[in-house]
Amino acid sequence: MNPNQKIITIGSICMVVGIISLILQIGNIVSIWISHSIQTGNQNHTGTCNQSIITYKNSTWVNQTYVNISNTNVVAGKDTTSVILAGNSSLCPIRGWAIYSKDNGVRIGSKGDVFVIREPFISCSHLECRTFFLTQGALLNDKHSNGTVKDRSPYRALMSCPVGEAPSPYNSRFESVAWSASACHDGMGWLTIGISGPDDGAVAVLKYNGIITETIKSWRKEILRTQESECVCVNGSCFTIMTDGPSGGPASYKIFKIEKGKVTKSIELDAPNSHYEECSCYPDTSKVMCVCRDNWHGSNRPWVSFDQNLDYQMGYICSGVFGDNPRPKDGKGSCGPVYVDGANGVKGFSYRYGNGVWIGRTKSNSSRQGFEMIWDPNGWTETDSNFFMKQDVVAVTDWSGYSGSFVQHPELTGLDCMRPCFWVELIRGRPKENTIWTSGSSISFCGVNSDTVDWSWPDGAELPFTIDK
């Protein structure tokens, strides 16, 4: 074969290979286009499960442990449209308290990523209940948990997570920078109140649906503070109480009316011989009832009730079953402050039913241990110490702490009344235990008109942790 023939032969072979390659590329493009068309046609699949509409997009591997679901729209039997929480229902009749949640945060935090917290509380919208809490900007069993016994620091923040879940960086939502806080839902959005700053000039930052709407400056320049539990929304307006002034003497107490995050009215209570801190508030037939902590001189709890115009009445729970800690043995009550063991105190709550009252309190008279609910059928107005029933929820040998009220509106429960509920903080660590940190978990209960049980639901963590050794 002469050189020209070789050149022609090699060129022909190259041309054939090129044509074959081109055909393969065209086939590949056609195949990809057909495959993409099929996937696009089947990308959205809508299924009905018990009248709940669930839309899945992208790939779902049902027969494997890993499920990749993104861009998911779930409507599970709840109307997600906004409503106005009326707050005009009366409290549901109840016979006792059923366990609602327990997060086991400290137990889980010995090995998992769980926030160091205190002052947890629960608040519900018409769609869900969330646990709010004040973090210390640190995780359990980590070096930054050292010294978290301190109440006020620039690292503290109000965050929230689904009720019953341990508060971690993976399930929690930032709400506000705060070392004192409150939050509530009016049916259209979340109002959060976060207080931060120096003791002599702290500022409360109000947010509505995450956007700053108002600020309130400390007016007495002596540790402005608020409820550490939920505020109350009635017919589109939300209400909260703040305190500014001494913790062991007369201070200043203000009620604020807030609409969509903006203060529309406020009044200062005329209470020269009373002390109101860390109030636990709830709606009842369009009014607001708050039961508070007297840290000055009362071992029974002060209360204030007000309407939407902020016209108020005030007093102390009269019962000889005393609700604060420390406190004397049950005995003769008073409709004013009971001065015996009246100094200091702990956040707590009660629910009024006519002349009767459900009193939540520690089981110990002198330390934050144990927790019980007591029904005194005449305790709101009478001073004797007789009561009808008692339900134990934390044993006296186990640690408790703050407690507070929250309600579930008819728009959430479907009932025709306001369901009363409460939470209990289970404090662990310093100053009572040999750790470098202070944190806690929480339990909660809701009132039911059916059978309940006495038991103890303690924190249950085994201390010290690795970081403490």
Curated annotation (Swiss-Prot):
Per the UniProt topology annotation, the Virion surface ranges are 28-469
Q: Which GO terms describe its cellular component?
A: host cell plasma membrane; membrane; virion membrane
Report keywords, A-Z: Calcium, Disulfide bond, Glycoprotein, Glycosidase, Host cell membrane, Host membrane, Hydrolase, Membrane, Metal-binding, Signal-anchor, Transmembrane, Transmembrane helix, Virion
Region Involved in apical transport and lipid raft association: start and end of each range? 11-33
One annotated GO molecular function: exo-alpha-sialidase activity
Q: By its UniProt entry, which InterPro entries does this protein fall under?
A: Glyco_hydro_34, Sialidase_Influenza_A/B, Sialidase_sf
Region spans: Head of neuraminidase: 91-469
Tell me which residues bind substrate. Answer: 118, 152, 277-278, 293, 368
Q: What is its EC number?
A: 3.2.1.18
Swiss-Prot/TrEMBL GO biological process terms: carbohydrate metabolic process; viral budding from plasma membrane
Q: Per the record, what ranges lie on the membrane's Intravirion side?
A: 1-6
Listed name of the protein: Neuraminidase
Organism from which the protein derives: Influenza A virus (strain A/Hickox/1940 H1N1)
Q: Which gene encodes it?
A: NA
